[in-house]
Amino acid sequence: MSDFTHFNEQGRAKMVDVGEKPISQRTAVAAGRVLVNEKTFALIQSGGMKKGDVLTVAQIAGVMGAKRTPDIIPMCHPILMDGINLDLSLDETRKSVEIRATVTCDGRTGVEMEALSAVSIAALTVYDMCKAVQKDMTITDIRLVSKTGGVHGDYFREEN
């Protein structure tokens, strides 16, 4: 078990000590989508959803989700984030809400989980705001697109 940094001597989960790691500039980008039907798409597009402006509320929820990541994922460190940006757009061809989150910080650990949380919470918010109209929406393709900084180097996902 000693090769795994997330386990203590008894084999139980622990939060990794990052105190000795150097501070570096870090960025993570995550993305995902919510597939909807034509009626739901039209209501989102026109601003006609009874709960309000779906894209704006989901954007705010995504920012809040990134900030709350260590509260819902046990081994995530609380991180002082420098920036959280969510872009939500409508894809007419797919009939989807496209979600992209970028999170930045100067820190000892990365912000991948914060970016993924932002996308996930934004997607769940889209679902919540539209569920009265459509129950069979699909939240899909949540993924890490890229990350920079840290001792493990940069990562860029091959995207189509």
Predicted features, each with a name:
Residues 1-55, 60-77, 83-160:
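C-terminal binding/interaction regions
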